[in-house]
């Protein structure tokens, strides 16, 4: 058996001009070209096939669907549709086939155009398979690398955003803390400068004042925020100092009005923390007392020299670390004792009044609970306020009058009288039940209705017809 590569299923004709039969076959009719027409898209058809498929239908190439309407109309008018050069070459290469095609004679032998099969070389399939596998692995590796890189970038971006957010929150908290510290320092300075000095603070002028446009140094606010260790009160500490430290939380309490102080007290006021422009004092922070000169524009004197005691501040923690609210201690002169003592007395009075109001409120709540407990009504059976129920039939039968017993004995003798009596009683009861609820206050009630009301007022829950109508028994 010959090898597969040597099998030849049909002849393959090739002319001397270099044209193959496969190149001269129309893709529509699968015959050799007859007056070939070459379109602008370089696809060639027979002229009859072109006229049937292109010219009469949609004016598009059957293979590539390119629009050729303008080209077809122009060449049809000029009669240049047929590619004469290709037609001449086909006639020179295949004269017999062209002659039979022109005469309309079909070819007896059909040329089978099957290419010769080719056997693969040893290892060619394995190499092709390995190349395909390596290509797929490389593509997968590249895809995984791209995904990993994208995930790393995304994680880095998330971490950066989180870090920025935390940094922003920390910066915001620090700014808020600084604002709170600054507000607290201002409140402390206003508390110390308020009261008697409310009118004169704006007129205070230091003797050795710096220029007005001098900017405050950065970080001066820290000296008002340093915590001071608790010390045992000594003889030098006066009672107003201790009262002010005990009531440091009541900073926002209304200050004493200026009208309560005299002009002499205003002149003797000493400024402890800040100057009139709100800037911290430029004096050093040593325990010793330094002398400052201030000008007070009071009604009595225009300029008076006063001594002010320096603020004693001691820090035990780092300035950059977080710390609680600063505790300020200072040595006040004897001239401040009336004002501070009055403030302490006023706060003590307010506290005592609040305690008394709280005790009164608790007492009122306790009394109200006792009253609610006393006013509650017990409706259980057997209690004093229980619901009044109807009495049993046995009690009703025992309370009947002798007239009723005589009537019952007479009724038992004759059946006819008993029936008529019962019917009369039923009619009377129905008439009574129909007329009693609808009676009007202006109409006089009979004696029987008065008897019924009297029996109801006595407290009985059920009565008989003879008690309601005593005239019937007689």
From Swiss-Prot:
Pathway noted in the entry: Protein modification; protein ubiquitination
Biased composition (Low complexity): 233-243, 443-457
Matching HAMAP family: RNF168
RING-type zinc finger span: 26-65
Motif UMI motif: where in chain: 152-160
EC number: 2.3.2.27
Chain span(s) of sequence motif MIU motif 1: 174-195
Any one GO BP annotation for this protein: positive regulation of DNA repair
Protein's UniProt name: E3 ubiquitin-protein ligase rnf168
InterPro entries for the chain: RNF168, RNF168/RNF169_E3_ubiq-ligase, Znf_RING, Znf_RING/FYVE/PHD
Motif interval(s): MIU motif 2: 353-376
UniProt-annotated stretches for the region Disordered: 1-20, 192-259, 367-474
SMART domains according to UniProt: RING
CDD domains (alphabetical): MIU2_RNF168, RING-HC_RNF168, UDM1_RNF168
Domain topic, free-text comment: The MIU motif (motif interacting with ubiquitin) mediates the interaction with both 'Lys-48'- and 'Lys-63'-linked ubiquitin chains. The UMI motif mediates interaction with ubiquitin with a preference for 'Lys-63'-linked ubiquitin. The specificity for different types of ubiquitin is mediated by juxtaposition of ubiquitin-binding motifs (MIU and UMI motifs) with LR motifs (LRMs).
Biased segments, Basic and acidic residues type: 1-12, 367-383, 422-432
Keywords: Chromatin regulator, DNA damage, DNA repair, Metal-binding, Nucleus, Transferase, Ubl conjugation pathway, Zinc, Zinc-finger
LR motif 2 (motif): residue ranges: 379-390
GO molecular function: chromatin binding; histone binding; K63-linked polyubiquitin modification-dependent protein binding; nucleosome binding; ubiquitin binding; ubiquitin-protein transferase activity; zinc ion binding
Motif stretch (LR motif 1): 119-137
Disulfide bonds: none
Pfam short name (any one): zf-C3HC4_2
